[in-house]
Amino acid sequence: VTGEAAPGDLRAALSAGLVPAMRARDAVTVSALRSALAALGNAEAVPSGDRPRAGAMEEAALGVGAADVPRRELSEDEVRAVVEQEVAERVEAADRLRALGRPADGERPEAEAAVLRGLLDAARRRA
């Protein structure tokens, strides 16, 4: 994946690599990139606080944008940490599958980890 991104901008590299991977029908790369981008989206979520989760309709948030939640801006170090965690989870999954005697099933998470590692390395070189 060779997404053009600003120096050190790992999120931009993840996003930039997604469309070419989809066009190439590279399922492993698409899965790795989508998963990492989703993990970043989750990390940006701000806890909803004291908004009621259920109850009377008059307490419900209604209208355009009512379901939107505030987001926080992740630093480049935080983005890198989230992607590194995604790599670690895939390596762990591959190891578990191999330990269960299913080495072929461990190839996919290992390949996804390699995609993300490559982007992490490229982002470090650009920084």
Go through each PLM region and give its residues.
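Charged, compositionally biased, marginally structured helical/coil segments
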Residues: V1-A127
